[in-house]
């Protein structure tokens, strides 16, 4: 098992580095072969997932390609331990925020951080910083030191370590955002015409904008600056439309919509999707704001009732096939409703009511999986 695990990890890293910038004619075949190997490994070493697959009459003989790999509902990460490796030897474990029930959170065991970090670096470089290697990063969200079991906090700490200049800084410490120090840093960057990457969760910006408005402050950021946003308003007491949020960011920081990028990620997956606008702009293409997946991730948009792929322009549940999830579940059915289009996908919101129930695991199934 150990040797097979090492070989799979090595081949995933090779795949990421081979296809992170462009795809060749062998890409589809290579992706399919690797997914099938990962599925076989998970079927043999992740017992709850094996039982789940068998309940759906899926096994190593019946699954013929990556589209047929059984999609584990994302809710399962709350109910089950989904790992091919010994969780006592895990390099890290990520917990979801648990905004509604802190004792009922998703848990994602990461046996080896090499693939997680390589996936993060490759995706970030291509989609966020296509034209530069380093930038001053100002974070509104805590890093690993203050939030050790958060995948987003590890993401932020990794971004600063790999892509941040020496004067990059995390301004969220001791459970609060240090507005005064952040404003000093923003004023300094404005004065020196220094490009910055302002990085935060969606709700962080709501609080920051309210504070700046209250104190009658705004900034004229350098034109190469980027505002990086992730998440949404799930479980928050106040919700703001993303259109309104981005309009406020544009006016407060004197940036264009093309300078604002949103990242799609979650605890249960190991790779992220991004708005494509910065990449499109860097390649002198028509700029779109749809989300795209990296080469080591494939997505499908599935009908909420039949779970069959929808046509272009239709909405459905997002299915996520992530090679970097080699040690848990390679294929996940999210609860996010998205629209499929020619340039990627657009997130509409979370599934609700009967739709959410339809993409979850029943209590009876849970008893059989444990």
Predicted segment positions?
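Generic structural signal for hydrophobic residues
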Residues: 49, 120, 155-156, 245-249
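Helix-loop segments that flank and shape redox-cofactor active sites
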Residues: 22-30
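Ser/Thr-glycine-rich phosphate-binding loops at phosphate-binding pockets of nucleotides
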Residues: 93-103, 143, 202, 266-269
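Internal, well-ordered alpha/beta segment that forms a basic, Gly-enriched binding/recognition surface
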Residues: 99-100, 109, 116, 120-175
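Long, charge-rich alpha-helical interaction segments
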Residues: 19-22, 73, 217
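Domain-scale activation on soluble regions of proteins
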Residues: 1-21, 55-59, 121-127, 147
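Active-site diphosphate/adenylate-binding microenvironment
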Residues: 25, 41-95, 103-109, 118-130
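Active-site glycine/GP-rich loop and adjacent strand/helix microenvironment
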Residues: 1-16, 29-41, 134-136, 149, ...
């Amino acid at each position: 098992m150990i040797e097979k695990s090492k070989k799979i990890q090595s081949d995933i890293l090779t795949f990421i580095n081979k296809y992170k910038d462009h795809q060749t004619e062998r890409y589809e075949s290579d992706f399919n072969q690797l997914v099938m190997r990962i599925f076989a490994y998970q079927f043999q070493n992740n017992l709850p997932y094996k039982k789940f697959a068998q309940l759906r009459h899926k096994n190593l003989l019946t699954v013929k390609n990556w589209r047929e790999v059984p999609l584990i509902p994302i809710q399962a990460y709350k109910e089950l331990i989904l790992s091919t490796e010994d969780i006592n030897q895990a390099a890290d474990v990520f917990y979801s925020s648990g905004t509604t029930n802190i004792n009922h959170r998703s848990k994602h065991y990461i046996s080896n951080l090499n693939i997680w970090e390589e996936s993060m670096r490759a995706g970030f470089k291509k989609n966020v910083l296509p034209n530069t290697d380093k930038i001053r990063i100002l974070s509104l969200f805590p890093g690993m030191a203050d939030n050790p079991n958060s995948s987003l906090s590890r993401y932020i700490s990794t971004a600063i370590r790999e892509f941040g200049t020496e004067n990059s800084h995390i301004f969220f410490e001791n459970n609060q955002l240090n507005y005064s120090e952040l404003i000093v840093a923003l004023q300094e960057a404005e004065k020196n015409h220094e490009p910055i990457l302002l990085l935060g969760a969606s709700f962080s910006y709501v609080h920051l904008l309210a504070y700046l408005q209250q104190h009658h402050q705004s900034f004229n950021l350098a034109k190469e600056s980027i505002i990086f946003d992730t998440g949404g308003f799930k479980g928050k007491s106040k919700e703001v439309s993303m259109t309104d949020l981005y309009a406020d960011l544009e006016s407060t920081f004197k940036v264009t919509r093309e300078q604002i990028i949103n990242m799609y990620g979650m605890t249960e997956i190991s790779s992220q999707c991004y708005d494509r606008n910065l990449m499109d702009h860097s390649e002198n293409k028509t700029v779109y704001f749809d989300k795209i997946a990296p080469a080591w991730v494939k997505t499908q948009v599935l009908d909420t009732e039949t779970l069959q792929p929808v046509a272009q322009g239709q909405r459905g549940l997002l299915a996520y096939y992530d090679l970097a999830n080699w040690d848990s579940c390679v294929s996940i059915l999210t609860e996010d409703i998205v629209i499929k289009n020619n340039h990627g996908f657009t997130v509409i919101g979370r599934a609700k009511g009967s739709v959410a129930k339809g993409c979850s695991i029943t209590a009876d199934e849970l008893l059989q999986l444990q």
